[in-house]
Amino acid sequence: MSSSRDQFNKQAALYATSPVHRSGPSLPVLVEMAAPKPVDQVLDVATGTGNTALTLAPLVLRVIGLDVASAMLDQARARAQAEKIENTEFVSGSAEEIPFPDAEFSLVVSRHAPHHFHRLHKFLSEVRRVLKPGGRFVVADQISPSAKIEGWVDRWERTRDPSHFRQRTVAEWKEMATVAGFSWIQDQAVPYELPFDWWVKQAGCTEKAVHELQEQAGTADEVVRREMGIKFNSSGGILSFMEPMMVVRLER
């Protein structure tokens, strides 16, 4: 299995300009749920090219973006400099070992990343540790629409991006968040319709991987096709599919 560091260092330039990541529909929902305040000290975990951090920066006191991929951080710093955003800092570090003291932040966010985390329970524990009492944690991530197709979804995602680990259901997220000590405040489904050709290009898929994805979709049963919203052209090729996304606000 490829590491997230390798995958995103390789594709950093594409992610910096990707409209899905830079301004996709989960971003305004995340910002609204976060209810940013001018006094907030914010941590953006797995910041990537800094899209969430740089959106929040004008609304808060300070934002730190954390990521394991140095090329992604370089893109974030370049954008901050180009846009003259001065209250951000981008640092290297793991979501499962956050390099900051206890109760350092009033708001933690993470967008389009936890499906890469092997130890989600450790990530949740670390977020709770660095949050101040009463602090907010807002996360947006891909989910599996139901437990019955979870295995198919993960195989599909991993074929496209070997650094993918697992897309959990909303029920699994609720259980793990509760165990970690969070209060579940609100959640909202934000489905994305993704063009297949764009999706495979974004990950740098090989021809073999694209063929395997076409085969998986072509042989999927009706339940999978319906829940994933897979659309085909007249030749049987994939046009697009629905990527189920959840945005949730938790509080310490």
Predicted regions and their residues:
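Class I SAM-dependent methyltransferase SAM/SAH-binding core
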Residues: 41-45, 49-97
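Short alpha-helix
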Residues: 166-180
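A short glycine-rich, Lys/Arg-flanked "PGG" loop and its adjoining helix->strand segment in the class I
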Residues: 121-136
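A short acidic, Gly/Pro-enriched loop at the edge of an enzyme's catalytic core
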Residues: 96-107
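Conserved Class I S-adenosyl-L-methionine
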Residues: 49, 184-252
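A short SAM/SAH-binding and catalytic strip from SAM-dependent methyltransferases
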Residues: 106-119
